Amino acid sequence: MSQLQVRHDWKREEIEALFALPMNDLLFKAHSIHREVYDPNEVQISRLLSIKTGACPEDCKYCPQSARYDTGLEKERLLAMETVLTEARSAKAAGASRFCMGAAWRNPKEKDMPYLKQMVQEVKALGMETCMTLGMLSAEQANELADAGLDYYNHNLDTSPEYYGDVITTRTYQNRLDTLTHVRASGMKVCSGGIVGMGEKATDRAGLLQQLANLPQHPDSVPINMLVKVAGTPFEKLDDLDPLEFVRTIAVARILMPLSRVRLSAGRENMSDELQAMCFFAGANSIFYGCKLLTTPNPEESDDMGLFRRLGLRPEQGAVATLDDEQAVLAKAAAHQDKSTAQFYDAAAL
């Protein structure tokens, strides 16, 4: 019998009960759901590039790009178009199907919007999906980016509403939800997840996933990040999260949002191959590929491909699934179950 449910009314106690399951039971449930929708041996690959680095005015306590903390990070202006396109071509050649561009802003300036839209169009012309993360968006900005052809927009919720004030004070939780509303309304696909290991409690991890799963439409991509502790940030000396709690978070995300891509995101550089293998089994089916995620380390491409070979995994080819038609995806899952269980842009200012 199928365990797959697409719901938007999850209660906190239901989610906490999933987290409390014996590990074998939780992994079995998550993996069974994963196999109903996706090929469990395919992983979608994205490449993430920082197109504008550092000097962010926000006070996110985990972030080395905040201007409020002395992390030794050198700020950089918005990258030149050819620099971005060179990176995109390299990503495509390495097997990435999606190219994500991130800027350390509170929100994009109007004067930069024409250039950002051109960037989207140029990358799409290479035959890649496009994603951006630029901070908060107004409804008008979301529509502009959608009209330019941007496929995905990333804006993470970070943590639960209850713990959020311990992480950031310069942007409200509602600000983040409003941006996601604008992105959905524009027709772009939503990429939204969070970070674990920031000193939060287990109920906060449940609360983060509750917020994501109870959105009007589940995010198409759900990045789950393990905190990367950076010297100079307020979170640099936090205790490490039990790795098995990270696996549990991946598994519960898969159960709550069965049609979403669950991305094994930041923190993989410090994860063992065995831990990553457990995450893939638990339902993670997307990674960021390349030696750096914005400003934090990531496994070398050769290491990732070596791990894929050892696990029998392969990069996903062609177009990725979307949540545009939940009933069609559910029908497909049911059928599958029946068969088998110059570097910088001169005009930009910081």
Curated annotation (Swiss-Prot):
Domain Radical SAM core: 41-268
Keyword DNA repair attributed: no
An individual GO BP term: biotin biosynthetic process
Catalytic activity, EC: 2.8.1.6
Cofactor note: Binds 1 [4Fe-4S] cluster. The cluster is coordinated with 3 cysteines and an exchangeable S-adenosyl-L-methionine. Binds 1 [2Fe-2S] cluster. The cluster is coordinated with 3 cysteines and 1 arginine.
Catalytic activity, as annotated: (4R,5S)-dethiobiotin + (sulfur carrier)-SH + 2 reduced [2Fe-2S]-[ferredoxin] + 2 S-adenosyl-L-methionine = (sulfur carrier)-H + biotin + 2 5'-deoxyadenosine + 2 L-methionine + 2 oxidized [2Fe-2S]-[ferredoxin]
GO molecular function, one term: biotin synthase activity
Pathway involvement of the protein, from the record: Cofactor biosynthesis; biotin biosynthesis; biotin from 7,8-diaminononanoate: step 2/2
Gene3D superfamilies: Aldolase class I (3.20.20.70)
Residues reported to bind [4Fe-4S] cluster: 56, 60, 63
Classification via SUPFAM superfamilies: Radical SAM enzymes (SSF102114)
Origin: domain of life: Bacteria
Pfam families: BATS (PF06968), Radical_SAM (PF04055)
Chain sites annotated for binding [2Fe-2S] cluster: 100, 131, 191, 263
Family as reported in the entry's similarity comment: Belongs to the radical SAM superfamily. Biotin synthase family.
Protein name: Biotin synthase
Gene coding for it: bioB
